[in-house]
């Protein structure tokens, strides 16, 4: 049985609880300009923040480039948006 990591982080009033594993961590770190110590939860926050700051994108855009087995819930307290994704059933829920 695969042991899935559970991580929590807060960056600039964006809260994220992540469980699982991302397979393409190195590629995503490069894509988002993150340092070598960035983990899965930081990658999710940065993907969300990058897309949020670029304009209105569909919520599922955040998870399109992420490969692996994971689920996360993200809350952006500045915009009061919540975002839940689960790769196991390909669902992305977004609440604003």
Name these PLM-found stretches.
Residues 1-96:
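N-terminus-centric sequence/structural signature that marks the extreme N-terminus
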């Amino acid at each position: 049985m695969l042991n899935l990591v559970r991580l929590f982080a807060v960056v600039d009033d964006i809260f994220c609880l992540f469980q699982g594993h991302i397979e393409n961590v190195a590629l995503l770190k490069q894509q988002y300009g993150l340092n070598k110590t960035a983990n899965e939860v930081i990658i999710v926050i940065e993907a969300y923040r990058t897309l949020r700051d670029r304009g209105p994108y569909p919520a599922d855009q955040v998870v399109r480039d992420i490969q692996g087995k994971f689920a996360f819930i993200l809350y952006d307290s500045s915009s009061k948006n919540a975002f839940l994704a689960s790769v196991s059933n390909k669902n992305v829920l977004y609440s604003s």
